[in-house]
Amino acid sequence: MRRICLDGNWSLIALSPEKNNYGIKDGSSFEINMPTSVQDALIEAMVVPDPYYAENELETMFIGKSDWSISRSFDLEIASGCRYVLHLEKVDTISSLILNGRQVASFDNEHRIYNVDVTEYLVSGLNDIEFRFTSSEKIASRRAEALEHAVPCSRYKYDSPNRNLVRKAQCNAAWDWGLCLQTMGIYESIELYECKDLYVSSFSAIPVRSATGDWKLDIKVYATAFADGGTTLAISCAGKELTVHVKYGAGDCVFVASMEIPAEDIKLWWPNGFGEQVLYDVEIAIAGFVLSRKIGFRTIEVRNNTTMGGKKLTVCVNGKPVFCKGANWIPLDARPGRMSMERYDSMICDMRDANMNMVRIWGGGW
């Protein structure tokens, strides 16, 4: 397996843009450092002002009403017998993928992960890749016009109508706490994978506690096979190792395995203020792919015991009732390009220091 990262400098081109005060016309070209949004690139290049200041929000809304192209070239030497899969996350939103002048795929859901087999579209040597973005507001309006009956949605003084007809972060179209910034772009690394028999996209690791107190770690590995075959799956966690042989047929497949871990080898994870937040690394290796993630070993249940006047709602962690204290998490920023891990870490540490132990993830963002 080989991973080729396509992050870095791309070209941003306006396609029939809406009327604006910044001289941006059809074919206007700029640099964009991917992954990021079109809005972030134009703001950082000082082509348009920061929408947070004064009434600049109104001055920059034309960006989300326009269409844009993001493209670059890259060298590749095709390896015999290999397949090539393009891995994409947080594609925002209505867009098409074009490789060497041929349309490969189209996307219309920001909340999905896409793994696109692009083998037949690549050549040895120089390859041209382009993402062509269509205004979500335009698409939403077309969908609204096609409906037999109108579907209402939240409206604000300055907003983008019909937000509920496009699968993207709803707050992009304005909210009571946020500005209207109908973003478009790609917000995670753009990765091309070279692989032979299998492409492994992800895995899950769920700890389950038995009545004796011992643990079972349930593993599911999600992959795509290009032909029938078999291979070895290796799993490690908490000093334990497990190796199993798995067989597969061509197409999407899921490999399932379980690892037994004695209770004495595990330190429990506790909410803030109740104990330590001990995390363990889980690593899997299969067909040249090595994936890892951190997990905490704990049980969580909601108890609805009958009490005077109704029922309780008590969250229990490791059998202990928890008095929940927390906050509602909205997106860190209206500009996706500024959502760094450092800012996430800082905010979460602030919540910890304020003695919070629960966070509700608001559903209208990322």
Where are these regions (language model features)?
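Secreted/periplasmic carbohydrate-active enzymes, especially glycoside hydrolases
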Residues: 1-364
